[in-house]
């Protein structure tokens, strides 16, 4: 048996064994509130052998994914070895960028929806970065892990509770990382607030507020290509919080969710759905496809989450109404509060004035509480860009952890819990706002897991 045939045989054997084990995790249990039996051991705090060089495979290099081409081309110890996209135009753009950086030529794949499997079969890929339309996140991440790769997937991690359980089970069975790349957790402000929380500045935490408020009606004009070509349809199919993780991720880290506390249940309501139909009527001909859709997703969705420890979190979603951008980023404790957009702080003890008034001068707070990671890498992150540097810093940190044998900052349990707001909110809205339980994706490990530390 040749070396190539032997590798193919061993890989196929692993996939078959894994599929058999995963099938034993009853899908009916995954789809309900019942915690399925584990197919492997926990990956909480998973540390994998150090990699001298991290060989990166990229699936999807369009509107979002092209940024990863630039970031990984600039990070020491990372090398892009394979790129897949069904759109030859964006693939050519990625190839041009690689050439301009003077990096080694990666393999390129573009023939058909499943061309990514050719990338997964390569032996020169250690991690797979997935930046595709949402519906592909779950199958691609699962197949990547079954192929022996570590999966890094854009938000949300998956769209149903069953799919989220499937990724948890696959990660545990294969002992591979499956990180949902929540970039906002690497923003300067979010890192600073995490540092403040860990130093006890706000006292005992009580309540958080998170959001994705971002007017995106203009994406409806993207018909055949780009994000709006597939994302618009979600507003005609679901009524709930379609995109919860940008605001929720940082707040969950402040509260040590999955590491001392856990999301317990949520209740969700939506406003009327008016804005997208009105926009379509104004911007498109009467017989245009955008005017043939019935938009059911409320313009504003508000979900309230209760944690096992009794804390509350409000999560909002609005990509339709005309208003300024906001993620809220509010955290309230017994000693005071921080709120974002704009940044402001009020403390009973330790503040510069009365807690009855906001302190909006952040300079002194940055000077004292900037996260060590931002102090170390912030200048380079800002120079390399990506939402103010958070994208570059996230990619840098991923590579750093893999090269130095450290656990990642986000794991499959975080991605599952944060992404679960989407299907649970849809279920709650459809049930007159009645509460829906979060699965315990950690299977109890949250009770003993160590909080996310302050690393530099």
Curated annotation (Swiss-Prot):
Binds 1 NAD(+) per subunit. The NAD(+) cannot dissociate. The keyword Repressor does not apply. NAD(+) binds at residues 63-64, 85, 134-137, 154-155, 183, 243. InterPro entries: Gfo/Idh/MocA-like_OxRdtase_N, Gfo/Idh/MocA_oxidrdct_glycsds, Glyco_hydro_109_C, NAD(P)-bd_dom_sf, TAT_signal, TAT_signal_bac_arc. Keywords: Glycosidase, Hydrolase, NAD, Signal. It is an enzyme of class 3 (hydrolase). Disulfide bonds: none annotated. Coiled coil: none annotated. Residues 1-33 form the signal peptide. It comes from the Bacteria. GO terms for molecular function: hydrolase activity, acting on glycosyl bonds; nucleotide binding. Its cofactor is NAD(+). Substrate binds at residues 212, 231, 243-246, 325. Predicted to be exported by the Tat system. The position of the signal peptide cleavage has not been experimentally proven. Its EC number is 3.2.1.-. Belongs to the Gfo/Idh/MocA family. Glycosyl hydrolase 109 subfamily. Glycosidase. This is Glycosyl hydrolase family 109 protein 2.
